[in-house]
Amino acid sequence: MLRDLKPTDNVGGFDVRPGNFLLNGATTVSGGVNFTIHSVYAVECTLLLFRPYAKFPYARLRFPDSYKIGNTYSMLVFGLDEIDFEYAYSFDGPYEPEKGIIFDKKKYILDPYAKAVIGQSGWGKKQEHEGVYKARVVNSDYDWGNCTQPKLPFEELIIYELHVRGFTQDGSSGVKNKGTFAGIREKIPYLKELGINAVEMMPIFEFDEMGSYRNYDDRQLYDYWGYNTVCFFAPNTSYESDHEHHHEGRELKQLVRELHENGIEVILDVVFNHTAEGNEMGPYFSFKGIDNNIYYMLTPDGKYYNFSGCGNVLNCNQPIVQQFILDCLRYWVTEYRIDGFRFDLASILGRNEDGTPMDKPPLLKSLAFDPILGGVKLIAEAWDAGGLYQVGSFPSWNRWAEWNGRYRDDLRRFLKGDSHLAWDAAQRITGSRDLYDPTYRGYNASVNFLTCHDGFTLYDMYSYNEKHNLENGWNNTDGANDNNSWNCGAEGDTNDYNINKLRIKMIKNAFATLMCSQGPALFLAGDEFCNTQFGNNNAYCQDNIISWLDWTRKEKHKDVFEFFKYMIAFRKRFHIITDSRGKATCSYPPVSIHSNVAWSAKYYDDTRMIGVMYAGVSLKQQGLDEFVYFGVNAYWDYVNVELPDLPEGYHWKLYVNTGNEPQDVILEDRNVILYDRRINMAGRSVIVAVGERY
């Protein structure tokens, strides 16, 4: 048994024996710590032990040759379970850069399986020892109590994308622990009030916000978003407020537990397409020093491919890298009980070692069928910076969903009044069946969104025609140029009453459209109270008021906040919007598309009015049908609209009419009954009606 193991050797003054080769990383076992790491091309591996926060190791333990099986080194070091220490590795091997092999035994190498990383003392502070990352062994014990995961159906998801720091860092957030996991915990009552049922956190794996630190016009710029990962198994220590236990992940676990207790799932934005090591000029602290030519896609002359736009690309379908990614996701699911993952630039995960797209990528298939990941939500950003665009065609095995970029682009254009878009907009609202039905995936594969961290906020989408990214320091050349936005008559903030009134209506139109569309829905934190980034559509480096949520706007735009709450509650109440698999008893189709004339879908070039009716069996009133009609008039003038006829005994009641501001939400005891099924819709407005029995 493990507890009966005895030392067999003494290395570097420590009692040791060959370790358990199946325990990746550093693991506390009875009597000591088990260290395991892999390298194909190294000829020598040395374990480095440091006293806390020391720059240089106090012990070097070279793995004896007998402690290596295949390409795996493993050693159990006795006594380390009783002392406080940090560790790293050193690898020696050939230096043949033309082949991508670049060993340097002088470099301290971070364990890729490290569960906690030492190197920075807090957010915005440079590394204590530049270029040096060390790891700690963590106590993973945590009492989850009787808490269970919500396990929500995919179609019911209303996802709230947030940045851990930006969500509460501004003083207006009113929380004690600003910019941390604990700060989000303090806002759980707010999330419950809003009604969302999933949070998607932008990257929380350990990253170095100082990695691209620079000054521009007396403004400090950081790697704020966190898409340059340093360590994939460790939470970002800067997001933790509990400095006593900040290397054990307890604060994140407490957040996940309390979100689950409130029926809210947790989705992580993960970045397996590249790392923080960059290109040939980038830092050297992990994969480069272990097996550079294994972990990264390299050209025939040893240079880095750059399909990520960030300097390097992980060689995801190489078996060793594939196993690493699987191990990582399994760890987050089992240790932190994460409910789902959104994969940044996921199309890279389907390329082979020279970048060629694969029909059935082994990694994506493994993730789809892995038993531990079964039931975990897998969401792809189905494109990359190398020009591969796979929305509607991402390899899925009926397990993968996609951020539907077509939904964002088509509906942004349609809602602002562009022509030739009625058919496309109708397809997007009704689950993008033109994209997903041919592969038998259904609308659950379409994660619908109009805003996310990339691009304008919803308020800015109707306040700016052009991006305003000068503060990023690239002379306004960064960020997308084609935003499909419309400033409603003035660029940026204005005192013009009519323009501001129109902007609010457009915001409500957009969100009502999202909530009345089939497929999981996602929106950006702060959209519910008109948060602004002042026209910056690429705030990746802005750790300031540009990217922090301004909570004073919640009171200023209370009507928008209340509208968001109402539409979220409406979507939850009428399940036929999200689940149209059951036909109505009256034999109406589950989904039907209309123009301003009922039962007639016209897609003329100048058509800017769409009506969608959902029909199905009511879950609350047994034996009865329910009907929801959503109409959007993107034209700038009134349009007379005819709603579909209903079965005998039913009539239409109007619930929402953004053309009737400020009373755009109609209280149920004051619902307008459309006896003749007609309404003169105002320009640039939406209506929502419910077919009810009388």
Model-derived features: where do they sit?
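Carbohydrate-interacting/catalytic domains
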Residues: M1-Y160, R165, E186, L191, ...
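Short, solvent-exposed loop/turn and secondary-structure capping segments
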Residues: L48, E98-F103, G171-V175, P203, ...
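Core domains of carbohydrate- and sulfate-ester-processing enzymes
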Residues: Y87, F91-N146, E209-T229, M281-K303, ...
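Conserved alpha/beta catalytic core and glycan-binding cleft of carbohydrate-active enzymes
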Residues: A114-V117, R337, E353-D354, D359-A525, ...
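Hydrophobic faces of well-ordered beta-strands that scaffold small-molecule active sites
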Residues: I158-Y160, V199, V266-L268, F341, ...
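Substrate-binding/active-site clefts of carbohydrate-active enzymes
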Residues: H163-A182, E186-I338, L345-F369, L435
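Short, polar loop/linker segments at the starts of domains and inter-domain junctions
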Residues: G171-R185, Y464-N469, Q663-Y675
